[in-house]
Swiss-Prot record:
BP-aspect Gene Ontology terms: chaperone cofactor-dependent protein refolding; protein folding in endoplasmic reticulum
GO MF annotations, alphabetized: FAD binding; protein-disulfide reductase activity; thiol oxidase activity
Signal as UniProt keyword: yes
Name the record gives this protein: Ero1-like protein
Organism: Drosophila melanogaster (Fruit fly)
PANTHER family: ERO1-LIKE PROTEIN, ERO1-RELATED
Length: 483
């Protein structure tokens, strides 16, 4: 064999080895190839690590705390009768524009609640007896005399009429409502004509097909008309939202407001992606179709490529609103422990009260709560900010009446009311006064305490927090699929 032949064979062998090596490297590139920093940085979760801005907590801590301790407890609690029936007005007219965009899809409709399905204790709660002025009515005075009706006592001469006239009662009622509404961060409509009980288990929050101009108008109104706004208007289609870099140039109150709305928006989008209509074919588990996670839709809503780099920051804002509502539950814990959670079903009522106490203890032991005192702490300017917050959130709850999909409207109203209740708790002077005076430690509390939440507010608070908890849990599932 000549030298030339040997060299030719060696070159051929080397070429074969090189080709095989290249093929092998390509197929195993997931393990051995150099990591492309550009590629790894462009995923939905690239910002979900480290400290949560404006909070003394990090993402991993919240993930573990929620997924291991809070989410399982909420799953068993929110199916109970006290929390599954929510009273809401879905017939309220839109106060901002003609209601011209009704969703005709069957998934937009709310399934009516059977009257007999609602526990009697909820229906017969006697809402008027919760009002501050009730104790002055004639009804409240009947049978309330401590005096003897003996023969030596002329009741007609000694009777002290402690009741008030119907006209005065109505005026007291208006004063009481006004005083209570002063601390509200949302519009409460459960007492209005047209309000009804809705079974939340029959109407889960999931994809309905409601989209297009009507849906965009809702969020555009919330962001543009209610947000404090940024200085830089970007040219892309996400100019309705404040770019995260612009948030560095605004004060904490403005930044927190935007992050709360953005976090709520992200949470709702995660619900739609995790409970997506995959097929309208009837399934034995759900006659309305086959539902499940849609990874493609999740990436479309949150990946940097489709959101001009903002999607991962929107996901990060979910943790911010979660910590706000978590802190509200911790602050209201002494009050919430005094609630009866009454439905008239004694065994279940006892179970709910035990479950509430257990979850509140877990929440109170969380080490990195949001510091609500960081907001509105700048003297006179803070008074105006606090007033603006209330007006803006009340306006957002009005906008929810403009949603053209009844099921979307239901969950939008519930979550904005839950958020409003959380803010009411965090910034209520009455709650601060009651707590500082040791009111919740007393064995007996007067029928009309200085601070009070209605049943509807409590139901909204826990269910809204349940939605945020569910979003963080579902996000971990998407993260596992996209790794």
């Amino acid at each position: 064999m000549t030298t030339r032949t040997v060299q030719r064979n060696l070159w051929a062998s080397a070429a074969v080895v090189l080709v095989l090596l290249l093929l092998w490297t390509d197929t195993t590139g997931g393990y051995f190839a150099a990591i492309d920093e550009t590629e790894t940085s462009k995923n939905c979760f690239c910002e979900l690590e480290g400290s949560i801005n404006d909070c003394s907590c990090d993402v991993d801590t919240v993930d573990h705390f929620n997924n291991m301790k809070i989410y399982p407890r909420l799953q068993s609690l929110l199916v109970k009768n006290f929390f599954r029936f929510y009273k809401v007005n879905l017939r309220q007219e839109c106060p901002f524009w003609p209601d011209d965009s009704r969703c005709a899809m069957r998934f937009c409709q709310v399934e009516n609640c059977e009257e007999q399905a609602i526990p009697q204790g909820i229906k017969d709660k006697g809402e008027h007896k919760e009002k501050a002025a009730f104790k002055y009515t004639r009804e409240a005075q009947v049978g309330g005399s401590a005096c003897s009706d003996g023969e030596d006592f002329d009741s007609s001469l000694g009777f002290l009429d402690t009741s008030i006239s119907d006209q005065a009662h109505r005026e007291f009622e208006l004063w009481a409502k006004h005083d209570e509404a002063e601390e509200d961060f949302c519009i409460v409509d459960d007492h209005e004509e047209g309000s009804q009980y809705v079974d939340l288990l029959l109407n889960p929050e999931r994809y309905t097909g409601y989209k297009g101009e009507s849906a965009h108008r809702i969020w555009k109104s919330i962001y543009l008309e209610n947000c404090f706004g940024g200085n830089n208007e970007t040219a892309n289609k996400f100019s309705n939202y404040v770019p995260h870099l612009d948030l560095r140039n605004v004060c904490l109150e403005q930044r927190a407001f935007y992050r709360i709305i953005s976090g709520l928006h992200s949470s709702i989008n995660i619900h739609l992606c995790s409970k997506y209509l995959l097929s309208e074919s009837k399934d034995f588990l759900d006659p309305q179709g086959i539902w499940g996670p849609n990874v493609k839709e999740f990436k479309r809503r949150f990946s940097p490529e489709t959101t001009s780099g903002e999607g991962p920051h929107w996901l990060r804002n979910l943790y911010f609103i979660y910590l706000i509502e978590l802190r509200a539950l911790a602050k209201a814990a002494p009050y919430l422990r005094r609630e009866d959670y009454y439905t008239g079903i004694a065994e279940e009522d006892d179970e709910v009260k035990l479950a509430i106490n257990d979850m509140l203890s877990v929440i109170e032991n969380f080490q990195s709560h949001f510091d609500e005192n960081a907001l509105f702490s700048n003297g006179i300017a803070s008074i105006k900010f606090k007033h603006d917050y209330k007006e803006k959130f009340r306006n957002i709850s009005r906008i929810m009446s403009c949603v053209g999909c009844d099921k979307c409207k239901l969950w939008g109203k519930l979550q904005t009311q839950g958020l409003g209740t959380a803010l009411k708790i965090l910034y209520s002077e009455k709650l601060n006064l009651a707590t500082e005076s040791g009111l919740w430690d007393k064995p007996h509390i007067e029928a009309d305490p200085i601070f009070r939440l209605s049943r509807t507010e409590i139901v909204a608070l826990f269910n809204a927090f349940g939605r945020l908890s569910n979003s963080i849990y579902e996000m971990e599932n998407f993260r596992c699929v996209l790794r």
